[in-house]
């Protein structure tokens, strides 16, 4: 597992991971149980066509009618993903079944093209560890789509082995981050569209697997911004998320979560005294210039007369609202007065991004407010060369507890925004 990270608290050796995990576990303010432990049952059939890799402990089982060419392509894609995961990324391979083999079942109707499922807990492991098997959709086009699908399955199998207690939303997002590193030909991303079309939602949303795969935009951004090498920070999250679940429990241990690890590891990462709240706020601004673009809560012309806008959708913790203000018609010496109000018990961070006609962010201006406040205001000046502004409101969590992805449902908060020429 890689340890070469820019974040000092993640760049540690294995003997120190355990004490680090104990520390981050204490930062979670909830006693939330982890995901349910639900071992899957491999599909059954009378006429499976079996083939095995000659390079890795992988065997596939194809339902009748699967072409030999597709069976061969699946094994080749699995071998390539296995090689890159365990080679360049230095991550552990999936744990197979009791026979020591990782099994693939070529069937129909698999979301994402392929997916690894929990087989069984390892009763001998000191920390939680699990074996897995994978389902592969027989309709997946050969070539890059099949490579990406098998990369998703192999990486998810590695995660089952390393940190099986991670919530499904975070798992899908992190798996997608590494799978796209492995699959260099991957292009087009409908999942990213799903993620960017709902910026007000929490960064992980158990109601939509497409949204959660798209949330790789967040984990990829964190990895690029703070990691020492591609994929290193995501793998560091796995290493620092070991759990101990009692035998016979119905749910995995609830801590530490990936966000517990980030909360400790990214302290002071942006500036001295910065926290994970500041990381959430920075990502909310940066996603405004990502492709595909996020859906704006409002888009308005230059407000020569003050306008008062209400949130069309309340913002969940770790989510954000983006309001676009076009500067067409604004005078050369224009100034914009921004006044934000939001509901009690929500902690929001507001900022303004100046963007040129090419979509490049020229400047980011934080709108200061004290902790637990429900009001913030600023006047934005020096708008020469600016095509439009994004006013961004990020919900960084409630005043009562830190964000826990295992909670599954989070209370969103609304806001009111007053914008007018000053």
Where are the regions that the model predicts?
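Beta/coil-rich, acidic/histidine-enriched accessory regions frequently appended to metallopeptidases
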Residues: 28-30, 34, 245-422
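Zinc-dependent metallopeptidase catalytic helix centered on the HExxH motif
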Residues: 127-204, 209
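Active-site-proximal alpha-helical
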Residues: 85, 196-289
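Zn2+-dependent metallopeptidase catalytic core
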Residues: 28-57, 62-131, 137-154, 158-166, ...
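Sec-dependent N-terminal signal peptides of Gram-negative exported proteins
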Residues: 4-25
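A generic secondary-structure signal for well-formed alpha-helical elements
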Residues: 81-85, 89, 158-166, 178-186, ...
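Extracytoplasmic/secreted proteins, especially bacterial periplasmic and envelope-associated proteins
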Residues: 69, 73-80, 84, 145, ...
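Structural helix-adjacent loops and short alpha-helical linkers that scaffold large soluble proteins
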Residues: 92-94, 144, 185-190, 225-233
């Amino acid at each position: 597992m890689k340890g070469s990270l820019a974040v000092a608290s993640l760049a540690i050796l294995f003997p120190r991971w355990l004490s680090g995990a104990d520390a981050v576990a204490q930062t979670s303010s909830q006693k939330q149980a982890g995901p349910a432990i639900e071992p899957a049952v491999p599909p059954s059939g009378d006429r499976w066509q079996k083939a095995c890799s000659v390079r890795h402990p992988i065997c596939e089982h194809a339902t009748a009618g699967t072409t030999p060419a597709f069976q061969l392509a699946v094994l080749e894609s699995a071998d390539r993903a296995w090689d890159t995961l365990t080679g360049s990324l230095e991550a552990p391979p999936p744990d197979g079944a009791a026979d020591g083999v990782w099994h693939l079942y070529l069937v129909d109707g698999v979301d994402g093209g392929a997916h690894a499922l929990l087989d069984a807990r390892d009763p001998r492991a000191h920390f939680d560890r699990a074996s897995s098997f994978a389902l592969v959709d027989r309709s997946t086009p050969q070539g890059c789509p099949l490579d990406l699908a098998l990369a998703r399955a192999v990486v998810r199998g590695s995660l089952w082995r390393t940190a099986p207690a991670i919530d499904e939303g975070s798992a899908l997002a992190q798996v997608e981050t590494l799978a796209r590193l492995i699959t260099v030909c991957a292009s087009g991303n409908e999942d990213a569209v799903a993620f960017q079309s709902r910026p007000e939602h929490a960064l992980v949303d158990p109601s939509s697997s497409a949204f959660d795969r798209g949330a790789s935009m967040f984990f990829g951004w964190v990895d690029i911004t703070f990691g020492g090498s591609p994929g290193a920070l995501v793998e560091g999250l796995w290493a620092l998320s070991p759990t101990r679940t009692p035998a016979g429990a119905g749910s995995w241990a609830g801590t530490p979560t990936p966000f517990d690890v980030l909360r400790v590891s990214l302290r002071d990462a942006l500036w001295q005294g910065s926290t994970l709240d500041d990381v959430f706020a920075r990502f909310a601004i940066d996603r405004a210039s990502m492709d595909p673009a996020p859906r704006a809560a409002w888009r308005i012309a230059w407000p020569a007369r003050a306008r008062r806008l209400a949130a069309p959708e309340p913002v969940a913790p770790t989510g954000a609202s983006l309001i676009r203000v076009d500067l067409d018609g604004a005078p050369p010496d224009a100034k914009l007065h921004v006044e934000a109000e939001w509901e009690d018990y929500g902690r929001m961070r507001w900022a303004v991004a100046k963007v040129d006609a090419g979509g490049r962010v020229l400047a980011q201006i934080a709108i200061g407010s004290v902790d637990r406040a429900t009001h913030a205001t600023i006047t934005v000046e020096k708008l020469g060369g600016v095509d439009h502004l994004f006013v961004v409101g990020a919900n960084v969590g409630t005043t009562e507890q830190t964000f826990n992805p295992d909670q599954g449902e989070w209370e969103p908060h609304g806001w009111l925004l007053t914008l007018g020429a000053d």
